[in-house]
Every structure is written in C-alpha cells, then in structure tokens.
Amino acid sequence: MKGYEVNFDGLVGPTHHYAGLSFGNEASTKNRNNLSNPKLAAKQGLLKMKALADMGMKQGVLAPHERPHVPMLRRLGFTGDDISVVAQAMRYSPELLSSLSSASPMWTANAATVSPSADSQDERVHFTAANLNNKFHRSIEAETTSQVLQAIFKNERHFVHHEALPQVALFGDEGAANHNRLGGDYAKRGIQVFVYGQQHLNNGLPGPKRYPARQTREASEAIARLHRLDDAHTVFVQQNPDVIDQGVFHNDVIAVSNQQVLFHHQHAFLNQDQAFAEIRQKMASIGEDFISIEVPENRVTVDDAVATYLFNSQILTRPDGGMTIVVPEESRQNAAVWSYLNDMIQMGTPIDAIQVYDLRESMRNGGGPACLRLRVALNETELNAVNPKVLMNDQLFMTLNQWVDKHYRDRLAQEDLADPHLLMESRMALDELTKILGLGSVYPFQK
C-alpha cells in the first residue's frame, strides 16, 4: 500500500505578538515588544502550505488555540465575566496576560509526537500531545491540541490518542521537534530517533549550563512505550549540550530528517559516531541505507545555523522521487549558509532542489518552516480516514485567506491584548474556523 508524509501546519492565531517568552530561543528574546502583524503572519503560513500542496505534497491545517486563555486566568484567581478577567490580568500582570495570549500553538512541531502504524505493534497511528512543561505559556496547550487532533484523526481503528505525559520536569516533552523518523517508503517500517537534552534520573551525565534542556530521555522513553515501538527499531540520542547553550533549544534547530537522509550540523549530537553506528545498523536491519549529510563548522557555524534556521527546514520527497529542502528567507540572506546550500545540491546527495519562503513574522518569534509543521506518515487507507476538510486545496486556501482578511488585525502590541474587542474578535474567528475545518466544539468557550 502506498505511503505519504502529510505535513499539518499550524495556522497562526489572531493574538500573534512578540512577548519574548521563550528563554533559550534567541530570536524570541531579541524581538520582545516589537509590533507584530497577525494578518501577515497567517498569510505567510498559508502561502507555504499552498505552495507545498501545489508541488504535489499532502498538506493539512491545524487550527490555532483559544487566546487569551481565560480558563487559566480564572484558575489564577481573576474573576468576573470574561472581559473583566482579561482587564484585571492586564492591570495586575500584563506579562501574565501576554503569556496566556501567546499564539505559540502555531508551532505544531511541538504539538505532539506521532508514530506511524508501520512501526507500532498494534498497527495503528499513535499520537501523544506534548506537555511542553518547560514553558508556562506552552504548558497549557496539550488539552486543546488533543481535542484538535482527535477531531482530525477520529477513526479508532486507525488512530490512537494518548494523554500528555505528567506535567513535571522529569517528563518534559517537546513533541516532534525532538523526534526524527528514518526509513524508506512512508508506509513501511522505519527507525524512530528520539533526541533528548538531559537525563534527569542520571545526574552524572553532561547537560547544558546556560539554557534549559527541554526534552528528557525519560519522556522520550515513555512515548516509545506508549506508542508500542520495538526496541530493535528505536534509537535514543543525546543532543550536544554545548549547542543547547548556543540557542539550539530543540533538535529541529540543528538537524532534520526525511526517509534515509539526516541533514545535521557537525556538532549536533553527543557521542555522534556511536549514535550513528547504532542508526546505521538498525537501518540495515530494515534493508535501508543511512545517509548522513553533515555540515561542517568551518562552512556554517552553529551561530549562523541558529540565526538563519538552516536546519529548521523541511526536506520533502517530491512526486518525481527527488528531494527539495524548504528554507526560510533568512537562509538566503546569509552568504555562508546560501553558499553551502547551493554547493550541497551539486554534491550528489538526494537533496537536489531548494525552495525559499518568507516566514518573517514566525521567524522573529523563533520559529522556521519546520517549527510550523507536524509530520504524520500515513498509508492510503489511513489518509482516507482523515477529516478531509483540513486538507489544503484551492478552495480551502481561498476560504482561509478570506477568513483571515475578515478577522485578523494587521498590527498588535502588548497593550492591545486587554482590548475586549480582541477577545471577541478571536472567539468569533475560531468559532467560524471550527465550522470551516469541521472540527466541532474544541475550544473552552464553545462548551
């Protein structure tokens, strides 16, 4: 049976703003308090989705979350009607309101970890929503993420949804941003590579000193168990703590995979030779080669990789069998990175084409092309069981652009978050979106 990689991109929400909430993510911190343009951000994301669909890729849309998140504000002691709750929060703690108004769910690489049916012992696709324990503004996402995923992947014969891991540091889980799958055809067995930053139950192991390690080995192992993965086809690799301290807060800022290919920086992993030997041996066991494309430090520094999000790219297999790398405009603007990319496509690797997209609104908040998408490998039967209303086509692209034009502002500053009109605008937009995408009632305000 034919297999597909389906990319589900997050639609940027109406409260997209620059709050600098993500310690360890240098772009996020640097752009704190800048004016944002939610309308432009949403349209930039939609353009990328449509362009990839036009290339023949399977492309889906994940809905933004309800923001400001009034239920959490109520848990924190703010009272009255919803508009009063938001107004009180702005008066007493604008930073807290900003945190609970973040449009961070657009970065769906952190939404969940997904294991395809070909790898799972029960032959079903498994989803575990990420608890995102390391950052308060993201730790509230898992419940809505699960609701949205269950509205898209409904059929229990094909899809299994797990609760997020316990909301403690020991099981800090950042989803697919620290997970790669290597293999051949998307419908056949692959090797799942879980990348972690720290092992909490073994304090003697190295870890970062400047910035936090957001993914723990304990979390990755728990997900592998939940997804009923075979140890013989699963690998756990530690990310180099030195690069975490240079701003590589997720593995998808320093490495990206597709099928047999792992595109990565020279300094991406700890004990890299040993890790790659295990990957190579396990790939051989499923009859596949492992192709490592390593970018040396003397061509692209870690600092340049972080600044341009070279590795926060997408590698896509085109219908003709070749691979295209999708990079942000910032990669083209950096001479060293652009020179390397153009040399790479002449090296005889499977990657033979480059596509560049302007995602500046997302990039300024610290998220590139790979942050914006959740990869789901499906066979033909499973793809036919997906809610068809979320799959990108000409009509959906037009409808969503009109929806953005109708509901989104073209500038937003932190002080705007207390505007009662913004709360009502956002809810009206999301209520309409759930009908467009056929999601049902997935938001707290709808219940």
Swiss-Prot record:
Belongs to the succinylarginine dihydrolase family. Pathway: Amino-acid degradation; L-arginine degradation via AST pathway; L-glutamate and succinate from L-arginine: step 2/5. Homodimer. Catalyzes the hydrolysis of N(2)-succinylarginine into N(2)-succinylornithine, ammonia and CO(2). Keywords: Arginine metabolism, Hydrolase. It comes from the Bacteria. GO terms for molecular function: N-succinylarginine dihydrolase activity. Its EC number is 3.5.3.23. One of its GO terms (biological process) is arginine catabolic process to succinate. HAMAP family: AstB (MF_01172). Substrate binds at residues 19-28, 110, 137-138, 214, 252, 365. InterPro entries: AstB_sf, SuccinylArg_d-Hdrlase_AstB. It catalyses: N(2)-succinyl-L-arginine + 2 H2O + 2 H(+) = N(2)-succinyl-L-ornithine + 2 NH4(+) + CO2. This is N-succinylarginine dihydrolase. The active site is at 174, 250, 371 (nucleophile). The keyword rRNA processing does not apply.
